[in-house]
Amino acid sequence: MRFLKSHPVLSLANSFLIDSPLPSNITYLWNFGSLLGLCLVIQIVTGVTLAMHYAPSTSLAFVSVEHIMRDVFYGWLIRYAHANGASFFFICVYIHMARGLYFNSYTKPRVLLWSVGVVIYILMMATAFLGYVLPWGQMSFWGATVITNLLSAIPYIGTALVEFVWGGFSVDNATLNRFFSLHYLLPFILAALVVVHLIALHEHGSNNPLGISSKVDRLPFHPYFTYKDLVGFFVFFLIFFGFVFYQPNLMGHPDNYIPANPLVTPVSIVPEWYFLPFYAILRAIPSKLGGVIGMFGALLILLALPWLETSKVRGAGFRPVMKFFFWLFVVNFFLLMYCGGQHAEEPFITLSRICTAYYFMYFLVIIPVIGHLENLLHRCRD
């Protein structure tokens, strides 16, 4: 133990993974941070292995994926672990963020922690989009065409920017090469940001369900929380490998098993499920530029959250009105996800607009107003 604390490198690992003091009352909702680290390791290991056999060429990409599935030793397992690992990565990150929203983990002194986390989330979405293009199936090709075309909504420079991203006048070989290179690079940038996230967490410690300072009631990370995390790992692997072995394509799209054909447009262009809420926001606004602003605004508004919160009480556990609106927000998010997967027709367009309005209203109106009203009631009581 003395060696761990005196070694210049191992002392850092010791302070983060062994001696790090955590509140004694944190629940299993706090396990998702470690699960996200596990997901990132799975994605990097399987992704690097897949890259050894993948050919980033429009004529070979689809065939190389089939080669991985059929000819590479346990290639099917590596590919399905990578594809389902992305979905589980987002499941864990959405729960992790929902816990942060519920317990106000974004307020001072954890503003930097929250901001870095949001940047990680946005970078995750970019990485996942780039990866979705690589199999070069129908949904990959047309998804890339639709999403990259959104840049053309930018006045004056939009068209030139789209052609710059494509590397030509359409989604083609140059685009696939660029997306593959970036998809390989971004996970390592994500890993670096995760280290920054952990440093920010270590600065002020973790939040807790009560939302109060817990400096007098803390436990070391090891052995109390390492074993707790191991329980979470076992449950995670049980569910994860259940999908990988028995339902590997449940969260995918059958059109992506058809080779990309620029001459045949799919009946419905649907992104992966974790993009659907923001895809619904994009389609809910009639203006192309307005839809793009709405979609990116829905992500960037999370960065402004620490400054929108006005309540002096941390967490929704002691705020019944806020708790009601939070769970309404969760239901609203799932409704957006459902609408994003449907055809752009009534009643889904109207429902998407209502859900989009509530999404922004929750952050811009409900959170600040309820906080001010609660503070006013506290002052009146005193």
UniProtKB/Swiss-Prot annotation:
Q: Classify the main location.
A: mitochondrion
Q: Spell out the protein name for this chain.
A: Cytochrome b
Q: Which residues form a coiled coil?
A: none
Query: GO: which molecular function terms?
Result: metal ion binding; ubiquinol-cytochrome-c reductase activity
Q: Where does heme b b562 bind?
A: H82, H183
Protein residues bound to heme b b566: H96, H197
Q: How would you describe this protein's topology in the membrane?
A: Multi-pass membrane protein
Family per similarity comment: Belongs to the cytochrome b family.
Record field: transmembrane: 32-52, 76-98, 113-133, 179-199, 225-245, 289-309, 321-341, 348-368
Q: What else is known?
A: Heme 1 (or BL or b562) is low-potential and absorbs at about 562 nm, and heme 2 (or BH or b566) is high-potential and absorbs at about 566 nm.
InterPro entries given for it? Cyt_b/b6_C, Cyt_b/b6_C_sf, Cyt_b/b6_N, Cytb/b6-like_sf, Cytochrome_b, Cytochrome_b_C_euk/bac, Cytochrome_b_N_euk/bac, Di-haem_cyt_TM
GO biological process, alphabetically ordered: mitochondrial electron transport, ubiquinol to cytochrome c
Ribosomal protein found in the keyword field: no
Q: Name one GO cellular component term.
A: mitochondrial inner membrane
